[in-house]
Design a protein with these regions (language model features):
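Alpha-helical transmembrane segments
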Residues: 102-106, 287-300, 339-342, 367-375, ...
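Membrane-cytosol interface segments
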Residues: 1-45, 290-319, 342-346, 374, ...
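Alpha-helical transmembrane segments of multi-pass membrane transporters/translocases
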Residues: 280-295, 327-341, 570-572, 601-611
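Hydrophobic alpha-helical transmembrane segments
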Residues: 80-98, 270-285, 346-364, 553-566
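Juxtamembrane/interface alpha-helical elements of multi-pass membrane proteins
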Residues: 92-184, 320-328, 338-452, 464-472, ...
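Short, non-transmembrane cytosolic segments of multipass membrane proteins
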Residues: 1-30, 183-216, 448-483
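Juxtamembrane "helix exit" motif at the C-terminal ends of alpha-helical transmembrane segments
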Residues: 60-86, 249-273, 335-351, 520-546, ...
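Membrane-interface, cytosolic juxtamembrane amphipathic helix immediately N-terminal to a transmembrane helix
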Residues: 24-66, 72-80, 111, 115-127, ...
Length: 622
């Protein structure tokens, strides 16, 4: 179910909240901003403002009821004598206010957020779409056909807008391709000045002579690549403060507070701290705040280069069964839990918190499921990236051979021998076989549904360029060869920009991953050991002291380790999401694979450090 269908059902369910629905509709239409209406139009949501407002009110009510449930649990935990703990009162106030307000804000602002996301993603499609247009124009200086080619070959959101533009031209909304390009440039110029400039350069290039045209087209690509690189540089420079805030708010301050909780109980008898408040604060409130802050950071990330889509029909995915993987993961988690319980039964120890077994079980389940489900996708994605990296050099070798006037079959077999050992060489070898042995033409040798060499190549970039080659060869081998060599240069430019962007962001994302997967578990483990020492020391003080054992007695070591362990797991999810979002954008495959890979290591590290810290600090206690 998507946002629209949920919104419609929710709006019908919550109509009772507003009484006269017609009056509410009228009031809602007047109260929303023009930006809100534009966002609905841009995203294509067939919703009315009143439906979204009703859904937001209903969500706030549900969130309020959920917060009351948490408050009731805290009250029950304190036997309904809440006045004995200031910290519990603070947590109850925060949950009661924060949850409904967050729900109201998220739902009511969702169309704006979605529209902003779509615009950012479309801006990331610019290098690919513009490169298709430029590549086509170098082979055939027909502006309308170049736009049709880009709209047809690209699966990006910007290409959808191009298809809409071409349709508008067909039904005479725009009189000519020049008018259509002017409209499109002005429309997107609000968000991307470099796209506007590049489109005007492309439009002027078709009216120039051959050499000048190629120079202008090259300049348009340079403008786009420089603009994309500049955007990412600006974004990376602005990331320093937000990442520092996340590191402070998410790792250092919360984990330092863990060791302070026993000491805080000394301040006043009314600063009683229970496990329920710590659970709500660490495992619900704090992760929620971090989640929305991370979401805000990633919403400002400019998209760069779209990821290659992987169809479910891929041969390596045909036998993939997510339900089966979930069952296997569940069995693995059960086995780990069983072994842990057997170990505790025969080797009980005060330095080994039994709640660690629950963390192991979750880590085993999630890691097993993620790796078995997403490893095939990751392997395919890596193969596509490897082939695309090889393709620039391969295209240059192929283009040079065709430029010499050699027939396609000879050029492909020569390139396959020159690039022997690479994945793209196998594709070229198969193409040559189709041309020579099966007597196919170039297009069929590449794209035939049964025997085409690109049948199992899922890179839209490679497929689009090979279509250009097939079209160019029909007209002139020499001209096609020259164009392919120039296209190879463009491709290398694109790859160099991608690489430089990765290098710029690499230091930051590697620091985030190291913090999430190594430093946070180590700091948490050491802090839990210190907490154990402080608790033991304070509980050993005379009863006449200001510390009352009851203030901290309800935080049993097992529960405390479990709550902090859950928080560490949440940190691993959140910080890896931030690192993945900065590095790759919205790449679910890479994210889930990374979590599956890092989670067990981090939980094992947390376990070892916690046990060693408790053992070390226990020897120091009086």
């Amino acid at each position: 179910m998507n946002f629209e269908s949920i919104c419609r059902k929710a709006a019908k369910s919550f109509e009772w909240m507003v009484g006269d629905i017609e009056k509410f509709k009228e009031k809602a239409n007047k109260s929303v901003s023009q930006e809100f209406i534009d966002s609905l139009t841009f995203t294509g949501m067939t919703l009315e403002p009143y439906q979204i407002l009703l859904f937001s009110y209903g969500s706030a009510v549900i969130a309020f009821l959920f917060s009351l449930f948490i408050d009731a649990l805290i009250l029950f935990f304190y036997h309904f004598s809440i006045a004995s703990s200031y910290f519990a009162i603070l947590i109850m106030i925060l949950t009661t206010l924060l949850f409904p307000l967050l729900a109201l804000q998220i739902v009511s602002e969702y169309p704006k957020y979605k529209a902003k996301q779509m615009k950012i993603h479309s801006l990331g499609d610019i290098p690919e779409v513009l490169s298709y247009i430029v590549m086509y124009l170098k082979l055939n200086p027909n502006l309308e056909n170049a736009f049709r080619f880009a709209a047809r070959e690209s699966n990006t959101s910007l290409a959808k807008d191009l298809r809409k533009l071409l349709w508008d031209m067909e039904i005479r909304i725009h009189k000519s391709i020049d008018d259509a390009i002017t409209y499109f440039a002005n429309l997107w110029g609000k968000w991307s000045d470099y796209l506007k400039r590049a489109l005007h350069l492309i439009r002027s290039a078709v009216h120039e002579k051959s050499n000048e045209r190629n120079t202008t087209l090259d300049r348009s690509i340079d403008v786009v690549l420089e603009g994309t690189k500049s955007m990412m540089m600006d974004f990376s420079q602005k990331l320093h403060q937000p990442t520092l805030v996340i590191y402070s708010m998410g790792v250092m301050i919360p984990l330092a507070l863990v060791a302070m909780f026993p000491a805080l109980s000394l301040i006043k008898t009314k600063f009683k701290i229970g496990i329920m408040e710590i659970f709500v604060f660490y495992d619900i409130l704090l992760p929620l705040v971090l989640l929305f802050y991370i979401r805000k950071i990633l919403a400002a990330r400019p998209a760069t280069f779209p990821l290659a889509p992987i169809p479910h029909s891929h041969p390596e995915l045909r036998n993939l069964n997510k339900k089966k993987n979930a069952v296997i993961a569940l069995i693995a988690a059960f086995i780990v839990s069983f072994i842990g319980l057997i170990f505790l039964k025969f080797f009980p120890s005060s330095i080994f918190p039994s709640s660690l077994i629950a963390l192991w079980a979750f880590a085993t389940f999630f890691s097993t499921y993620s790796l078995t489900t997403y490893s095939p996708y990751k392997r395919i994605r890596d193969e596509i990236k490897e082939m695309e990296n090889e393709f620039g050099d391969a295209l240059y070798v192929l283009g040079k051979r065709i430029m010499e006037g050699k027939p396609a079959e000879e050029a492909f077999i020569y390139a396959s021998h020159a690039l022997e050992g690479s994945k793209i060489a196998k594709v070229f070898e198969r193409t040559s076989y189709n041309l020579l042995s099966m007597r196919m033409n170039t297009r069929a040798a590449l794209f035939d549904e049964k025997f085409g060499s690109l049948k199992h190549v899922y890179s839209s970039r490679i497929r689009a360029i090979m279509k250009l080659l097939a079209e160019g060869i029909k007209k002139s081998y020499v001209a096609a060869g020259v164009a392919i060599v120039k296209i190879a240069d463009h491709l290398k430019q694109l790859q160099n920009v991608e690489k430089s962007i990765k290098n710029v962001l690499g230091t930051l994302t590697s620091t985030l991953r190291t913090t999430a997967n190594i430093f946070a578990p180590i700091i948490a483990g050491v802090t839990l050991g210190i907490t154990k020492l402080i608790s033991s020391t304070l509980l050993g003080m005379p009863s006449s002291s200001a510390f009352a054992a009851a203030n901290f007695v309800n935080i049993k070591p097992n529960y405390f380790v479990f709550v902090i362990g859950v928080y560490i797991i949440e940190l691993i999810f959140l910080l890896n999401r931030l690192a993945n979002g900065i590095d790759e954008g919205d790449d679910r495959i890479e994210y889930m694979y990374d979590i599956g890979k890092y989670l067990p290591t981090s939980v094992i590290l947390f376990t070892i450090v916690t046990i060693l810290s408790i053992l070390f600090f226990q020897s120091m206690s009086p």
